[in-house]
Amino acid sequence: MSKYAWYTRVTDTLHRLTVLTLVGGTLYMSGGLAYTLYMNGKKYEQQVTQQKALEEDNQQLQSPTAPPTE
């Protein structure tokens, strides 16, 4: 069995490290993006829910209630 030349091994190692770095970085960034989108969606949903509740409260306060009829 023949051995590879030292420069072939070095080139192969550098190539593997480059590919692993690119794949790992891509997965890391994709995970961070997914997390950020999820958290922003939750925050937006809470904000909209609170805003609707405030609008309903304001409508109830502004609408005059009819006096009870006997």
UniProtKB/Swiss-Prot annotation:
Membrane protein topology class: Single-pass membrane protein
Stored InterPro entries: COX14
GO CC terms: mitochondrial envelope; mitochondrial inner membrane; mitochondrial matrix; mitochondrion
Disulfide topology: none
Ranges for region Disordered: 49-70
Transmembrane segments annotated in the record for this chain: 17-38
First and last residue of the signal peptide: none
Classification via Pfam families: COX14 (PF14880)
GO biological process per UniProt: mitochondrial cytochrome c oxidase assembly; negative regulation of mitochondrial translation; protein stabilization
Compartments, record wording: Mitochondrion membrane
Keyword DNA-binding: no
Transmembrane keyword on record: yes
UniProtKB keywords: Membrane, Mitochondrion, Transmembrane, Transmembrane helix
Main location: mitochondrion
Function: Required for the synthesis of yeast cytochrome oxidase.
Further details from the record: Present with 6840 molecules/cell in log phase SD medium.
Protein known as: Cytochrome c oxidase assembly protein COX14
